[in-house]
Amino acid sequence: MRGPLYQPLGLDLDDGVIRRRRLSAATIGFACAATTIIAGSTAIALFGQPQPRMVDRFDVAASSEPPPTVVAASPAPVVREQLPVVISGSDTAPPPRGGVGFRVEDPQSLRQNPSTAHMPDDALIEDSAYGPLPARAPDGRRPYDVYAGAWSGKPGTRIAIVVGGLGISQTGTMNAIGSLPPGVTFGFSPSGNSLDRWMQEARRSGHELVLQVPMEPVGYPQVDPGEDTLTVGDAAAGDLSALHASLATITNYVGIMNYMGGRFVAEPAAMEPLIAELGRRGLMFFDDASSLRSVAADTAQLQSVPAAVSDLSIDRSQDPADIRSQLDTLERIARAEGTAIGVASAFDVSVATIAKWIGEARGRGIEIVPLSALANDPERR
């Protein structure tokens, strides 16, 4: 018999030990299989059914590299449509490229940007045989809104001062534009010289403009306001050619005011077609109050046209002390009523006195505002 060295390993164990070892091995194998199944089920539940992959069967046998690590793919980024870009009324920059822009309007957002205030808005111009006439834009904007001067919009004591006669004297016009602050409104004469040049200078300086239209006075034609005078008879007959001739001499104004016209503004038959034409074109009417019988304000109210009336004339006298006294009276009216409107001419003494007084009045809390800021505008309500 061969010795123990030549016996197969494990054959010297009794049956009980062999059975226990077989049982233990079977148990371990079963446990491993169960663990594998559970782990696989869990992986499938978490990551989904793995997709079959075609491989070369010889590569599997030949490759000794460990299997690659499976990394969950990052989710694709969500592509959203670009949101609209909100532009405030004071913004002038265009929306970002590719964005959708819309404007959130505020009460002053229709006003021209100061950098382009000297340029007429093509949408507000009607071509005619007389030249460019002011007109409402197709979107409803009015010259009255677009060419309006800027002011703070805050409540307080406010005064509007209209200085007329610009364009007649070149030196006087240059002096007025250079001396008076932006809040002052300028009245241009249609019979003036270099009107487009002075209009641009005034608008660049921040001034609001009105056009002084010659209208029939008492005593006409012996008392003659000048070329293209709008008469009562013509207006009542529906002939507004003289008005159109004046309107075409300049652009970028918010409305018109009467030059003389004591008889005209007192005649409803003449004022009604005039005010209707202004309303159609989106302009205001300013009454200088030279006639106590004027029906301008009432007619404008009935036709929903912006209008304003002067409270007093500042410079009937060319004495600086008298001008100063009138300005002080204007301030008292404004403090009692909240607002006041004064009218003057572009004489050198008037301009110098008004400019000095405005500087002092601002120190007392008075705001000098454009004429349109104090006009009654039924359409805006």
Which residues make up each language-model segment?
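C-terminal domain-boundary segment and adjacent tail
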Residues: L278-L292, A346-R381
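Juxtamembrane proline-rich low-complexity "stalk" or linker regions positioned immediately after a signal peptide
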Residues: A45-L133
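Alpha-helical scaffold elements lining the catalytic groove of polysaccharide deacetylases
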Residues: D224-A248, V265-A270, D298-P306, S310-R335
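Active-site beta->alpha N-cap acidic-glycine motif
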Residues: D139-V223
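Hydrophobic faces of well-ordered beta-strands that scaffold small-molecule active sites
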Residues: I159-V163, V184-F188, L209-V213, I256-N258, ...
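Hydrophobic membrane-insertion alpha-helices, especially the h-region
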Residues: G29-A43
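N-terminal, positively charged topogenic segments adjacent to a membrane insertion site
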Residues: M1-A25
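His/Asp/Glu-enriched short active-site or ligand-binding loop at hydrolase and phosphoryl-transfer sites
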Residues: E277-I323, P370-A375
